[in-house]
C-alpha cells in the first residue's frame, strides 16, 4: 500500500465496536482512532490505532465535531462501514500478524525455529535512526551478484570491512564459506532522547563432523567510544560483530557487505533461503514492526540470490519501532538446545525478551508455560515502559523495585558453573549476540538489561543519548564466582563471618584429627595411664559401636559421652561427641545394650557407655590396661569405699558441654545460631537429663532393700534375672520378655541416675542406685558395669564388704568388681538365708540387713534405698505409715523386710531352690501378698521363720524401699530372678562360708569355678551371682580377678576386702545396691513360695 492508502472496514453486530475516536473539527484535528480493545470487533476487522477516519456509513467526518461523531456512532445499530486512511508509516496489525504467520510457517518447514519478540521503547520526541543490516558473501562471485537486485531507494550502500560473519561449514562442493554480516548503523540527527531497543540474535550454527563452535569477537566500535560533542551533528556509528568458526582455514577470503538502511519506522524481513547450492546456510528472518501510524514495506532479501526485493518507502516515522521479532532456522542440522531458554526460569529479570522455541511437537504443558511467560512479559513491559510513565502505579512499582534491589542479597550459589556444564553437554550450542539499543527513558531498562548476571552471551549496548556504545562481554564468568559481589548490609557481613568461622572450625577439626593430643595437659603420672586407658577405650568403643548398633540405650549414649571425656580430657570429649553423633538417636524400643554382648566382652562395652569409673573396674580394662595394680586397686576399691571419692584420672564437669555438644558445633553469635540450626537431640534424651537433674526421688545413698515379691515373681516367672554375671547371656531373653517399652523405661531411669556418677561422686552414687535399674537391661550383665562404678563410690569403705556384696549381687557391676569376695558371699547369704535357709548364714544375712536398715545413711546409699528426699519420698513415707496400720503382723512384716534386704541379685538366675531351702508356695500364692506387702504376712508362712530372724533388725525402712519399688514395678529386672540349676543351693551354703573366710578365698574359688561356692556362683551363675548358666562369665570374672585382685589383693582380708569385693563383684555380678528404681535388687527378698521350678 502506498502512502495515504484508503481502506474500507466493515463491522456487524452492533455496539460496542471496540475502538475509541479522538479529534474533530473543533479541535482542528482529523478524526482518528485513539484506542482499540483487544479481541474486539475493531481489532478483528483490521482497524489500527492512528487510522484517520474519512467517513462513517457514507457520512464524511471531515466537517464533524467530536460530539456529532458520537451521535452518529450511537445511531448505528447493526452494521458499521468505515473508510479510513492509513499513513504509509503504519501497517495494520492484521497484516503484520499474517506476515508473521506466513514466515513462521515457512520457517518451520526447514526445522528448528527460534523467535523472540522485543519491545522498543518509543522516544518522547522523534528522531531519525538508521539501522544497517548487511548480509555478506565471502566469495567474489556472490558479492558481485549482490547488485543484481533492485536497490532500496537510497538505503542500500556497499561496504567492505569487518563483519558479523556467520559461516557454517559448507559442503565440499561449495567453493567457499558464506558469512553473514550484521552492521548496525545509527544516524542521529537530533538531540532528543531516542528509543530503547533490545535486540537479541540467536543464530544456531550447523555443525558437521569436524566443526566446532564459533568464536565470537567484538572488534570495532572505536568510532563510538566518545560522545558526540556537537548535538546537532549527525554521525554514523557502526558496530561489527564477527563470529568466525574455529575450524576456519587460514586462507584469505574477500569480504564485501551490503548495507540496507532501515528508517526507524520500517519493517525489514531478511531471509536467507537455502537453495540447492547453499544447503548449509541457515535462514534468518528479522521483522521490524512499526509503531502507530507507521507503515513499512517489507524488504525481502534472499541470501542465496543476494537480491533485495522490495523498496523501502520514504517517510518519517513519528515514533520508533515498537516491536522487533526475528526467527532463525537451521536446516539440515540437529535441533539445537538453546541454553538460555532452558535457564529462563532462573534469570532474575524475566521480562527480557527470550527465544521462544517452536518445536514440531510441543506438549500442552510447554504451551502453557510459554503463554504464562508471554503474559508475564507483557505485564513487566507495561510496568517498565508504561504509556504514561508518570502514572501513580508505575511510579509506585519503580519505587518498590528500587527498594527491593537495595535490600536483596545476591545469591552466592554456583548456578553459573552448573550452567556452563549444561551448555557443554549440548550437542550444538548456538552463538548468541545480544544487541541493546539504550536511549534515555524513565523505564530503567538499562538496569534490566545489565542486571542479567546469569547471561553469558555478548551484549552490545547502544546509548543514543550519551553517544556511547558500551560493549560488555559477558563470557564465561566462572572465574568471577570466587569473588563475592560488592554487597553491603547485615546479610553479607553475616555470610562472610559465618564462612570464616566455619573455616576455622574445619581447620580445628583437621588439627584434632591429625594430632589427637589432649588440650589439657595432665600430670605426667596420670598421662601414661590415661593414654593407655584411652587407647584401650578407643578399641573398646569400636567394639561397643559394633555391638551396641543392635541394642543402644539412653544410658549407653549419655554415659558414653560423659565417660570418654573423663578419661581422655578434651580430646576424649571430641571423640565422644563424634561417637555420640554416630550413634543414632532412635528411641524406639530395643533390646538392652548388654544383651548382644558376649559374656566377657559385654562388661567392657557397658562400662564404656556407662561411665569412666566402670571402665577401670571392668575386667577387660584391667587386663588390657598397663597401669600398675595400685592404680587399679585404687580405682576399684575407692569407688566401693567412698561414693564421694572421684576416680584417679581427671574428670571433667559431670555433664560438661563437651559431653553433649561437640565443641566445634558451639556457635556463639546469634546470627550464626540463626543460620546454623542447632543440633537436635531426642526428646527422650532431654527428658532424661531433666530427670537426672530433678528426680522425683533423690536417693542420696542407695540401699539394699527387699524388692516387693510381686516384682520378684514377675522376674522369676520370666526366668530372666541372672544375678551379676548371670545376666550376661540371659539379658537378651530377659529384656525381650519384659517388653521393649518396659525396658526403655527402666533404662531411662537408670540413665538418669547414671548420668550423675560420671560427673561427680554424688552422681556416682546416683548411678549406682540407678545402675540397679540398668540391670533390667543387658546393662546388668554387660551394661551394668557403668552403673556399678558409681555404686563403688557409693558404698562406704567400712561397710564395704557387706555393701559390696550386695552390690555384687547386682549383676551389672559384679563383673566390674572382682575384688568383693566377702560382698559376694554376703549377698548370697542374705538372699539364701532369707529365702533358702537362715541357718546356713544367719549372721551374714542379719549383718547385711542390718547394714541396710541400720545404716541407711551410710551403707544404705550403696546397698539399700538411699535416704530419700523430694516430694516422691514424702508421698511414699505417708503411704508407708498408712500401710503399717493395716499390717496383720508387724513382726512378720519386719522379718520379711529384713529378709528382703538380703540382695535378691545374690540369687543366681540359674539357682533353684532345693527342698532344704524352700517351702512350696501355697497353691493360691499371689505375689501381691508377698511379705513386702502387709497382706502378704498371711501367705508367707513358709518364709515367716526366716523373716523373723532377719526382719526384726530392719523395721519400717525396708517397707519404704519396698513401697518405692512397688510404685515402680516396671523398673524391676526380670533377669534378677531366674532360678534354673539346682546346683546353686549347694553353692549358697559354701558361699556364705567363703564370705566369712576372705576375699582371697573368693578369688581362689572363682577361677576354679567348681571348688568354692564363689566359683560355682560365678561360673554357674548360681544362686548368689544369679549368673544364669554362663561359663564365659566365670571366665571373665576369673580373668578380672586374676589381674586386678591377684596382684593387689594378695595382701589379706583386711587390705583385700575392697579388692576382694571388686574381684568377687566380677564373679558375683550381683551387687545389691538398690534404689527404689532398682527393683531387681529389691527382688532379693526371695520366698520359697515364689520360686518357680
UniProtKB/Swiss-Prot annotation:
Region Interaction with ACTN2, annotated ranges: 481-663, 664-924, 901-1093
An annotated Gene Ontology molecular function: 14-3-3 protein binding
Region (Disordered): 144-174, 211-233, 329-369, 507-803, 834-870, 937-956, 1041-1064
Main location: nucleus
Region (F-actin binding): 534-663, 664-803
Keywords tagged on the record: Actin-binding, Cell junction, Cytoplasm, Cytoskeleton, Muscle protein, Nucleus, Phosphoprotein, Tumor suppressor
Record's compositionally biased regions (Polar residues): 565-579, 595-611, 793-803, 835-853
Renumbered residue ranges of the record's region Actin binding: 751-900
Interaction with YWHAB as annotated region, ranges: 607-811
Regulation: induction: Down-regulated in muscle cell lines derived from patients with Duchenne muscular dystrophy (DMD).
Region spans: Interaction with ZYX: 1000-1019
GO CC, alphabetical: actin cytoskeleton; cytosol; focal adhesion; intracellular membrane-bounded organelle; nucleoplasm; nucleus; stress fiber; Z disc
Motif PPPY motif: positions: 619-622
Extent of Pro residues compositional bias: 617-630, 644-655
Subunit structure: May self-associate in muscle cells under oxidative stress. Binds F-actin. Interacts with ACTN2; ACTN2 is proposed to anchor SYOP2 at Z lines in mature myocytes. Interacts with AKAP6, PPP3CA and CAMK2A. Interacts (phosphorylated form) with YWHAB; YWHAB competes with ACTN2 for interaction with SYNPO2. Interacts with KPNA2; mediating nuclear import of SYNOP2; dependent on interaction with YWHAB. Interacts with IPO13; may be implicated in SYNOP2 nuclear import. Interacts with ZYX, FLNC, ILK. Interacts with BAG3 (via WW 1 domain).
Function: Has an actin-binding and actin-bundling activity. Can induce the formation of F-actin networks in an isoform-specific manner. At the sarcomeric Z lines is proposed to act as adapter protein that links nascent myofibers to the sarcolemma via ZYX and may play a role in early assembly and stabilization of the Z lines. Involved in autophagosome formation.
Designated name of the protein: Synaptopodin-2
Source species of the chain: Homo sapiens (Human)
Amino acid at each position: 500500500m502506498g502512502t495515504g492508502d484508503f481502506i474500507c472496514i466493515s463491522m456487524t453486530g452492533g455496539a460496542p465496536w471496540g475502538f475509541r475516536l479522538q479529534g474533530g473539527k473543533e479541535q482542528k484535528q482529523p478524526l482518528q482512532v485513539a484506542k482499540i480493545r483487544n479481541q474486539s470487533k475493531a481489532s478483528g476487522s483490521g482497524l489500527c490505532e492512528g487510522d484517520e477516519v474519512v467517513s462513517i456509513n457514507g457520512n464524511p467526518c471531515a466537517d464533524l465535531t467530536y460530539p456529532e461523531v458520537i451521535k452518529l456512532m450511537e445511531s448505528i445499530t447493526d452494521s458499521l462501514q468505515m473508510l479510513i486512511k492509513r499513513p504509509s508509516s503504519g501497517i495494520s496489525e492484521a497484516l503484520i500478524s499474517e506476515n508473521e504467520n506466513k514466515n513462521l510457517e515457512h520457517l518451520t518447514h526447514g526445522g528448528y525455529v527460534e523467535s523472540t519478540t522485543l519491545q522498543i521503547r518509543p522516544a518522547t520526541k522523534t528522531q531519525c535512526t538508521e539501522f544497517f543490516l548487511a548480509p555478506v558473501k565471502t566469495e567474489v562471485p556472490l558479492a558481485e551478484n549482490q547488485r543484481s537486485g533492485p536497490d532500496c531507494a537510497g538505503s542500500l550502500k556497499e561496504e567492505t570491512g569487518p563483519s558479523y560473519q556467520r559461516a557454517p561449514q559448507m559442503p565440499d562442493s561449495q567453493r567457499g564459506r558464506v558469512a553473514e554480516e550484521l552492521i548496525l548503523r545509527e544516524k542521529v540527527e537530533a538531540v532528543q532522547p531516542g528509543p530503547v531497543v533490545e535486540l537479541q540474535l540467536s543464530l544456531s550454527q550447523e555443525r558437521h563432523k569436524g566443526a566446532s563452535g564459533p568464536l565470537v569477537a567484538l572488534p570495532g566500535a572505536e568510532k563510538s567510544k566518545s560522545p558526540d560533542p556537537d548535538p546537532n551533528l549527525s554521525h554514523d556509528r557502526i558496530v561489527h560483530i564477527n563470529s568466525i568458526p574455529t575450524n576456519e582455514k587460514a586462507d584469505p577470503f574477500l569480504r564485501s557487505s551490503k548495507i540496507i538502511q532501515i528508517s526507524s519506522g520500517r519493517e525489514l524481513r531478511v531471509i536467507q533461503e537455502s537453495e540447492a547450492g547453499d544447503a548449509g546456510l541457515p535462514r534468518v528472518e528479522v521483522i521490524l514492526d512499526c509503531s502507530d501510524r507507521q507503515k513499512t514495506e517489507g524488504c525481502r532479501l534472499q541470501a542465496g540470490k543476494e537480491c533485495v526485493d522490495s523498496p523501502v518507502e520514504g517517510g518519517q516515522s513519528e515514533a520508533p519501532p515498537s516491536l522487533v521479532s526475528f526467527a532463525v532456522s537451521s536446516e539440515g542440522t540437529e535441533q539445537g538446545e538453546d541454553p538460555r531458554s532452558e535457564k529462563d526460569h532462573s534469570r532474575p529479570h524475566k521480562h527480557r525478551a527470550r527465544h521462544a522455541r517452536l518445536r514440531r511437537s510441543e506438549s500442552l504443558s510447554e504451551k502453557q508455560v510459554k503463554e504464562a511467560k508471554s503474559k508475564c512479559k507483557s505485564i513487566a513491559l507495561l510496568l517498565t515502559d508504561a504509556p504514561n510513565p508518570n502514572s501513580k502505579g508505575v511510579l509506585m512499582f519503580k519505587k518498590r523495585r528500587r527498594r527491593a534491589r537495595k535490600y536483596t542479597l545476591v545469591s552466592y550459589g554456583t548456578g553459573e558453573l552448573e550452567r556452563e556444564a549444561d551448555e557443554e553437554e549440548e550437542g550444538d550450542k548456538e552463538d548468541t549476540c545480544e544487541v541493546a539499543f539504550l536511549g534515555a527513558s524513565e523505564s530503567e531498562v538499562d538496569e534490566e538489561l545489565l542486571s542479567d548476571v546469569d547471561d553469558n552471551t555478548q551484549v552490545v549496548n547502544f546509548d543514543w543519548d550519551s553517544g556511547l556504545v558500551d560493549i560488555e562481554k559477558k563470557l564465561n564468568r566462572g572465574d568471577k564466582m570466587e569473588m563475592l559481589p560488592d554487597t553491603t548490609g547485615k546479610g553479607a557481613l553475616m555470610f562472610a563471618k559465618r564462612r570464616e568461622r566455619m573455616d576455622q572450625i574445619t581447620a580445628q577439626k583437621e588439627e584434632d584429627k591429625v594430632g589427637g593430643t589432649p588440650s589439657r595437659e595432665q600430670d605426667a603420672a596420670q598421662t601414661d595411664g590415661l593414654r593407655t586407658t584411652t587407647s584401650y577405650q578407643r578399641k573398646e568403643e569400636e567394639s561397643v559401636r559394633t555391638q551396641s548398633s543392635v541394642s543402644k540405650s539412653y544410658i549407653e549414649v549419655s554415659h558414653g559421652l560423659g565417660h570418654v571425656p573423663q578419661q581422655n580430657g578434651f580430646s576424649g570429649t571430641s571423640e565422644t561427641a563424634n561417637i555420640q553423633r554416630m550413634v543414632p538417636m532412635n528411641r524406639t524400643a530395643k533390646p538392652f545394650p548388654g544383651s548382644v554382648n558376649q559374656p566377657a566382652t559385654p562388661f567392657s562395652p557397658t562400662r564404656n557407655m556407662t561411665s569412666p569409673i566402670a571402665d577401670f573396674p571392668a575386667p577387660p580394662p584391667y587386663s588390657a590396661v598397663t597401669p600398675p595394680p595400685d592404680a587399679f586397686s585404687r580405682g576399684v576399691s575407692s569407688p566401693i569405699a567412698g561414693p564421694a571419692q572421684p576416680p584417679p584420672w581427671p574428670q571433667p564437669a559431670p555433664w560438661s558441654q563437651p559431653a553433649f555438644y561437640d565443641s566445634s558445633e558451639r556457635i556463639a553469635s546469634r546470627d550464626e545460631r540463626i543460620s546454623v540450626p542447632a543440633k537436635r537431640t531426642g526428646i527422650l534424651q532431654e527428658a532424661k537429663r531433666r530427670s537426672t537433674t530433678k528426680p522425683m526421688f533423690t536417693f542420696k545413698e542407695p540401699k539394699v532393700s527387699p524388692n516387693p515379691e510381686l516384682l520378684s515373681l514377675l522376674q522369676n516367672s520370666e526366668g530372666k534375672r541372672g544375678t551379676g554375671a548371670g545376666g550376661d547371656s540371659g539379658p537378651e531373653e530377659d529384656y525381650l520378655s519384659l517388653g521393649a517399652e518396659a525396658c526403655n523405661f527402666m533404662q531411662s531411669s537408670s540413665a538418669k541416675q547414671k548420668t550423675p556418677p560420671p560427673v561427680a561422686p554424688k552422681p556416682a552414687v546416683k548411678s549406682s542406685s540407678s545402675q540397679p535399674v540398668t540391670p533390667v537391661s543387658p546393662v546388668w550383665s554387660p551394661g551394668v558395669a557403668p552403673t556399678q562404678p558409681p555404686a563403688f563410690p557409693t558404698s562406704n569403705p567400712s561397710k564395704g564388704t557387706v555393701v559390696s556384696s550386695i552390690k555384687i549381687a547386682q549383676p551389672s557391676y559384679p563383673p566390674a568388681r572382682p575384688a568383693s569376695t566377702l560382698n559376694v558371699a554376703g549377698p548370697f547369704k542374705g538372699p539364701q538365708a532369707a529365702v533358702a535357709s537362715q541357718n546356713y548364714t544367719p549372721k551374714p544375712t542379719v549383718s547385711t540387713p542390718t547394714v541396710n536398715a541400720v545404716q541407711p545413711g551410710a551403707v544404705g546409699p550403696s546397698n539399700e534405698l538411699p535416704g530419700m528426699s523430694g516430694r516422691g519420698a514424702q508421698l511414699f513415707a505417708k503411704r508407708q505409715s498408712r500401710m503399717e496400720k493395716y499390717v496383720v503382723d508387724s513382726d512378720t512384716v519386719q522379718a520379711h523386710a529384713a529378709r528382703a534386704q538380703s540382695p535378691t541379685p545374690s540369687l543366681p538366675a540359674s539357682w533353684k531352690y532345693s527342698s532344704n531351702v524352700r517351702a512350696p508356695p501355697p497353691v493360691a500364692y499371689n505375689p501381691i501378698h508377698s511379705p513386702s506387702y502387709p497382706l502378704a504376712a498371711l501367705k508367707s508362712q513358709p518364709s515367716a521363720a526366716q523373716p523373723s530372724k532377719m526382719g526384726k533388725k530392719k523395721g519400717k525402712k525396708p517397707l519404704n524401699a519396698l513401697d518405692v519399688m512397688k510404685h515402680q514395678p516396671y523398673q524391676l529386672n526380670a533377669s534378677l530372678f531366674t532360678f534354673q540349676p539346682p546346683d546353686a543351693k549347694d553353692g549358697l551354703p559354701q558361699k556364705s562360708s567363703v564370705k566369712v573366710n576372705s576375699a582371697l578365698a573368693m578369688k581362689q574359688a572363682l577361677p576354679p569355678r567348681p571348688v568354692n561356692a564363689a566359683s560355682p556362683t560365678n561360673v554357674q551363675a548360681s544362686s548368689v551371682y544369679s549368673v544364669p548358666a554362663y561359663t564365659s562369665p566365670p571366665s571373665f570374672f576369673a580373668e578380672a580377678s586374676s589381674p586386678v585382685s591377684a596382684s593387689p589383693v594378695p595382701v589379706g582380708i583386711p587390705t583385700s576386702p575392697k579388692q576382694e569385693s571388686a574381684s568377687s563383684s566380677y564373679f558375683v555380678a550381683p551387687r545389691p545396691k538398690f534404689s527404689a528404681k532398682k527393683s531387681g535388687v529389691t527382688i532379693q527378698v526371695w520366698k520359697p513360695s515364689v520360686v518357680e521350678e
